[in-house]
């Protein structure tokens, strides 16, 4: 099993399905070029085209094909494996829904291919800008953050409990990894206060 399949957490059967599927070398070459340029939009567009033409294994073939470049974006092996495990996670979500190995998360997994997202402990983080038409001020009225201000975006990946200690650990690691940011944003559905009406106190 080669590095990509090991680092992303695939089984041998999943690797076999991906490797043995027909390959569009022309399109895969364009995908590699997009990843070398860290062009997430181009990567997503090409993979959607590939999935439409060849089926849902194309995206996974593309991630494998560009892995030598992706690996350079994640020099820390622990962080790389934690981050790329999201690929096999979404592959299994797809298989559970459709009954075949594949993935249609072209836009989301473009982050991973281009080294634009990292998983630090329980949470994922990426560079971003404050998306809301809101101004945040301190007690003296000084503007701290407005729409478009560079911020750290936080994502809550599937799998495992969301314990306070795990969240605290992730935030501490992120503070060291992304020391340039003063603000973290998260717009997950998990933060919807209405969930308290239907979820138990022990739920995420």
Where do the model's predicted regions map?
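Short linear interaction motifs
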Residues: 167-171, 175-185
């Amino acid at each position: 099993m080669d590095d990509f399949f090991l680092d992303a957490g695939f089984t041998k059967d999943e690797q076999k399905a991906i490797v043995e599927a027909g390959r569009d070398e022309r399109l895969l070459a364009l995908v590699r070029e997009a990843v070398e340029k860290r062009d997430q939009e181009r990567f997503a567009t090409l993979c959607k085209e590939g999935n439409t033409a060849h089926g849902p294994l194309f995206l996974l073939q593309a991630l494998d094909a560009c892995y030598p470049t992706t690996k350079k974006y994640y020099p820390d092996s622990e962080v790389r494996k934690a981050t790329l495990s999201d690929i096999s996670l979404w592959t299994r979500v797809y298989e559970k829904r459709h009954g075949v190995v594949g993935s249609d998360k072209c836009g989301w997994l473009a982050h991973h291919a281009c080294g634009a997202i990292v998983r630090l402990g329980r949470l994922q983080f990426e560079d971003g800008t404050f998306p809301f038409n809101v101004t945040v001020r301190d007690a003296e009225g000084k503007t701290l953050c407005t729409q478009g201000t560079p911020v750290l975006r936080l994502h809550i990946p599937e799998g495992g409990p969301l314990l306070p200690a795990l969240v605290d650990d992730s935030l501490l690691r992120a503070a060291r990894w992304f020391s340039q940011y003063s603000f973290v944003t998260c717009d997950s559905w998990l933060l919807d206060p209405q969930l308290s009406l239907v979820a138990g106190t022990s739920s995420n």
